[in-house]
Amino acid sequence: FGSLLGICLMTQIITGLLLAMHYTADTTLAFTSVAHMCRNVQFGWLIRNLHANGASFFFICIYLHIGRGLYYGSYLYKETWNIGVILLLTLMATAFVGYVLPWGQMSFWGATVITNLFSAIPYIGQTLVEWAWGGFSVDNPTLTRFFALHFLLHFIIAGLTFIHLTLLHETGSNNPLGISSNCDKIPFHPYFSTKDALGFILLLFPLMTLAMFSPNLLGDPENFTPANPLVTPPHIKPEWYFLFAYAILRSIPNKLGGVLALAASVLILLLIPLLHTSKQRTMTFRPLSQFLFWTLVMNLLILTWIGS
């Protein structure tokens, strides 16, 4: 899945760059500029749909990648794992600020709700939020800085990916038995190149299918309405890939407690390497650990379902 994440990143950067050329980061024009892009720019609709749904595929790949890392004990490469967690956090930040850019209803209210969570931090919270907003509500300054951040964060992700790969290169990759791969080393081309090419096709085919046939399947219909600070949508919810965290946030009646639980749900990944006590690296021959792992997976799926 690592190679698929690489192709996702490249696709997102290319489509995003083309979109940025036609986008206007201004509250009065953002929504219209996106509409103009889809109507009047050559293949603009396709580029936009690929970029929007590409994010979904990016998250599918990264969740599978993390799941596989947990299953096969890859987190014992501590440096690689920790950079990976930082990559996940950066990706989540990027997806969040990117979702605000079309300036629809859900963009605006999603931004309002999530940035507001910073106000739960004692003492400095309120100041922090107003500083992030650039005013007393989500407005033009917020949109312009979110566009700048969205543009910047992709290159940060690309840089971190390079570090991630360099650290992995120090040790070599893991395998399902958790033993040394030295005796199994084979030439990259034609073996791995073919395997990767197949992966790319299996990734890009469903992405193209989704972008062509039902591009709005995963989006929120509220986002077809331009942002209106005076009308709150009946159900404020993020894109599907954040629903598990959002469900955790909403299920705790205390604001600070919810924020901490939300942060912990992702940051717990940093503790995983410290919690490994087995003599075996992978879960291949550990049925009890397997049971717990699949329970975790089901938990995440149920939380995602509840969150919607």
Swiss-Prot record:
Q: Which residues bind heme b b562?
A: 51, 150
Look up the coiled coil feature and give its residue ranges: none
Binding residue positions for a ubiquinone: 169
**GO biological process terms on file:** mitochondrial electron transport, ubiquinol to cytochrome c
- Kindly list the positions annotated as binding heme b b566: 65, 164
Required cofactor names = heme b
Keywords, ordered alphabetically: Electron transport, Heme, Iron, Membrane, Metal-binding, Mitochondrion, Mitochondrion inner membrane, Respiratory chain, Transmembrane, Transmembrane helix, Transport, Ubiquinone
Q: What is its main location?
A: mitochondrion
Under Gene Ontology molecular function, one entry of this record is: ubiquinol-cytochrome-c reductase activity
A GO CC term assigned to this protein in UniProt: mitochondrial inner membrane
Which SUPFAM superfamilies does this UniProt record tie to the protein? a domain/subunit of cytochrome bc1 complex (Ubiquinol-cytochrome c reductase), Transmembrane di-heme cytochromes
Q: Where in the cell is it found?
A: Mitochondrion inner membrane
Gene3D superfamilies referenced in this protein's UniProt entry, alphabetically: Cytochrome Bc1 Complex, Chain C
**Record's cofactor remark:** Binds 2 heme b groups non-covalently.
Q: Name one Pfam family in it.
A: Cytochrom_B_C
Record-annotated membrane-spanning stretches: 1-21, 45-66, 81-101, 146-166, 194-214, 256-276, 288-308
Topology with regard to the membrane?
Multi-pass membrane protein
Q: How does it assemble?
A: The cytochrome bc1 complex contains 11 subunits: 3 respiratory subunits (MT-CYB, CYC1 and UQCRFS1), 2 core proteins (UQCRC1 and UQCRC2) and 6 low-molecular weight proteins (UQCRH/QCR6, UQCRB/QCR7, UQCRQ/QCR8, UQCR10/QCR9, UQCR11/QCR10 and a cleavage product of UQCRFS1). This cytochrome bc1 complex then forms a dimer.
- Misc: Heme 1 (or BL or b562) is low-potential and absorbs at about 562 nm, and heme 2 (or BH or b566) is high-potential and absorbs at about 566 nm.
Its family remark reads: Belongs to the cytochrome b family.
Alphabetized PANTHER family for the sequence:
CYTOCHROME B
Which function does this protein serve?
A: Component of the ubiquinol-cytochrome c reductase complex (complex III or cytochrome b-c1 complex) that is part of the mitochondrial respiratory chain. The b-c1 complex mediates electron transfer from ubiquinol to cytochrome c. Contributes to the generation of a proton gradient across the mitochondrial membrane that is then used for ATP synthesis.
Q: Under which name does UniProt file this protein?
A: Cytochrome b
Q: Name the species this protein comes from.
A: Zaratornis stresemanni
